[in-house]
Amino acid sequence: PSQRKDFDGLFEAMNGYPVIIRLIDPPLHEFMPDEEKLLEEVVTMRVKGETEGLKAKEDLLVAIKGMHESNPMMGLRGVRLSIVMPEIVEMQVRAIFEAAADCTLRGIVVKPEVMIPLTGTVKELDWIQPRLERIASAVMGEKKIKFEYKFGSMIEIPRAAITAADVARDAEFFSFGTNDLTQMTYGYSRDDAARNFLITYQEQGILLKTP
């Protein structure tokens, strides 16, 4: 409901204009409580003998530990997360199209453009896009309304850029995610490179400017 309300506000504010909505991109652990803080709470509750709510916190802690990745940027996120846990993105797409349908019924012109992030191969779109399009059709059928919409892809992995002609068979539009694309092309970490070596590289003429 909260996401649907947010999308409703977006469509209303952008009446008549396309609204590009990127589906969930960050890894799941970014939406979870801080692991160290949660561990402190669990230990404190155990020491004090507090049992109410302890099991839930322990289960959450186990789940967070299970989501740990050595390199989250290149791990389970974007379209990969949508394929492994499709119920998350299906819920998000349903919220988008229910909000769009409700706005249409109120006379607002909506043009949702749903963007699938971190696509690396057209096979990923072949798997996820038909499922999302079925949700769009189902919502419009339930609401007895029709409106324009598109499904597109973010190009932020070098392989996606190289195989863009194949990706374009499914994607109705592209958006270039230049931050991730630059990091993966150069093999640089945006967070670390500037601090550790980019200044030296520019001083030594290896790079004329930061990528």
Regions from the PLM with identified roles:
Residues 1-211:
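Conserved alpha/beta-domain cores
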